[in-house]
């Protein structure tokens, strides 16, 4: 695979107008035309659009996904292969991106699973105040697309409808740049690095549940379930070869924007001290100790086959799936592969509880990306957009509702879109203590 040129077009303002076009930082949006595009899927009844800006006292509800618009202008395939079009290799050629903005998709979908590890939940986003400080999405100019779906859809049908609608609209937005000169171009070509450099890999533990569709992670539109480790080229993430579920939007499960901007992958792509040997997707969340040991052993063997001297190891999800991650750290270290583990921690409401649920002594280089469990107090909003006028702050049947614009008390950061920095993409400073 050859290199990928990533051309940047900065969006400083979004305006609803008569046509969809981009010029000198202004993105004009034809809401009626984009609504018709989203509704080409018969499972989508209608779509509407709003704009929210950084610092505005606006709250977005019912968020199912966040996407940075991108389009391929050279090379094989198109962005989001296997979802928008046929499966074709991506990660080379040229891709345009609209930076400084995102398409935020909100949907009032109530799935059949309302509690437990497979609960189907949406997220919220505050564009100001303490909630905004927890998420990168509050600093973006956001185009909010609210979808109405046909009644009676299964979780997988709803996911397909949401994803196809949002990716189609995101692609249309990015297509406004195809004939324009970019503000900047970044080239990602890990294969051009010298063979004499140390070889590094990124291992991402991806949490999935057996027999549960949509899976939390899909590769070229194919759900990753019950699999052992898969090697992918780092540039494939840039072009949307990895996509998430839109049904379970809690912050420890990354959404599309997170995969497009995976910070450990981007860091190694830009670091000329290493040869980036590949990204390993390690399926985690197995149910027995034996299965967990096999998954970790397999990930270590794959890293060895790539000639890895070093590994950045991180994860998605929560719960006992962390056992596979820690066993992978242990296995890599035992085979001479130097590791750094990047993970959020639990810590309890005051940060004094055990931060991780499982340890191995080989994990002697760990970066914390913050405490998931802190209580969040959100002030009242002047404006509410998105799918819900009322919110269930605790995701179980019978939980009380509150007005979406009222002051809110959240028991953790989970329900804030981007509220948990699972991979260390923020500019927070960690100190040892």
Regions found by a protein language model. Give the residues of each.
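A short helix->loop->beta-strand "cap" motif at the edges of active sites that frequently abuts
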Residues: 334-342
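A general structural motif
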Residues: 287-300
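Small-residue-enriched flexible segments
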Residues: 190-286, 397-433
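Glycine-rich, charge-decorated loop segments at or immediately adjacent to ligand/cofactor-binding or catalytic sites
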Residues: 346-364
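Long, compositionally biased, glycine/small-hydrophobic-enriched stretches that function as flexible linkers
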Residues: 1-223, 403, 407-408, 425-433
